[in-house]
Amino acid sequence: LFRPPERFTLETTARINPAANTKLSGLYLSNGVFCTQCEAQGFRRITWYLDRPDVLARFRVRLEGPQAMLPVLLSNGNPISRGTFGDGWHYATWEDPYPKPAYLFALVAGDLAVRRDHWRTRSGRAVELAIYTEPAFIDQTAHAMESLKRAMRWDEDRFGLEYDLDVYNIVAVGDFNFGAMENKGLNIFNTA
């Protein structure tokens, strides 16, 4: 495409091997959980992209996997569809309506336990809150949930900022290269 129109949609297909990715950068598989770490330039380990903080795009992500092995399928943004297909497979489609740089892209898929709650914004909009972790750590997430709600209240009180997505997910996993990554709508933390 040597002379693309001013506006167009580009769709790509990439083949990667997350199980062989031992750098914990990009998309990797560790202890049965698929996870991403895209800062600072990890997204380019997933697919070709202009991986710079000044290049912003909206992302729509469809995750597919065997439901027995990967019952949780998460990405940034709002869930827009879920379903099943084939013999024991399922999918989840996520759409982030706000442009963001690639280093804030996030994806997690695995067999994780969850603690759920909700938040009502100052304007009355409901936000679903969820903290996912390996089952052995789920009892340690109550404080994290209360901290999340206090932080959301602080943002509203201090800056007048309401959270603008329908869900806010946090994932804590054992094998995460950074201490934390504050991807919008899907924060990822190390359990250590």
What are these regions (language model features)?
Residues 28-33, 43:
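Intramembrane catalytic core of multi-pass membrane enzymes that act on lipidic substrates
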Residues 1-30, 86-88:
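A surface-exposed beta-strand-loop module
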Residues 35-41, 49-192:
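Hydrophobic helix-coil surface modules that form long, contiguous segments used
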